Amino acid sequence: MTVGVLALQGAFREHRQRLEQLGAGVREVRLPADLAGLSGLILPGGESTTMVRLLTEGGLWHPLRDFHAAGGALWGTCAGAIVLAREVMGGSPSLPPQPGLGLLDITVQRNAFGRQVDSFTAPLDIAGLDAPFPAVFIRAPVITRVGPAARALATLGDRTAHVQQGRVLASAFHPELTEDTRLHRVFLGLAGERAY
């Protein structure tokens, strides 16, 4: 099984390292053709407005939707979660509303956990994990609405931080910035369920 990491910007190298620690075959995705034969794809953290622009300019926007429709597992972390969302709030007032791929029935508020200087790590109880996960929040979004098709798997206080809808995961935090590979293992399990 081979999974991909969107490698346009952001923390893609760290995701690749975590996946390789688990023995997964990993391909960096920069072009639509790079999606061929993958079982899953991670959309990493970075800057969501830039990521949307690069996806659009690089011709990946619609192929990502097709990849999902064909059964590919997806996991968006931080900015990647924003890109997967149906509705995105809190973009710059000087820009038009930021589109999301709409593959996850959630509303996301950008940068809701604060600015770069407000970054923090917190133990997060995540459904399905046996112990708290050391979640790293950096200019992190908050999932403000979880639609009926999705389910919240973790909250920090009253803020949703991790959700799942079928074979799509979204995390408001950066799991790749820890040595803990449990969520990457969960993602590989979802990717392994793909039937070609």
UniProtKB/Swiss-Prot annotation:
Pathway: Cofactor biosynthesis; pyridoxal 5'-phosphate biosynthesis. Keywords: Glutamine amidotransferase, Hydrolase, Lyase, Pyridoxal phosphate. InterPro entries: Class_I_gatase-like, PdxT/SNO, PdxT/SNO_CS. L-glutamine binds at G46, E47, S48, R110, I138, R139. GO terms for biological process: glutamine catabolic process; pyridoxal phosphate biosynthetic process; pyridoxine metabolic process. One of its GO terms (molecular function) is glutaminase activity. In the presence of PdxS, forms a dodecamer of heterodimers. Only shows activity in the heterodimer. Catalyzes the hydrolysis of glutamine to glutamate and ammonia as part of the biosynthesis of pyridoxal 5'-phosphate. The resulting ammonia molecule is channeled to the active site of PdxS. Belongs to the glutaminase PdxT/SNO family. NCBIfam families: PLP_synth_Pdx2. This is Pyridoxal 5'-phosphate synthase subunit PdxT. The lineage of its organism: Bacteria, Thermotogati, Deinococcota, Deinococci, Deinococcales.
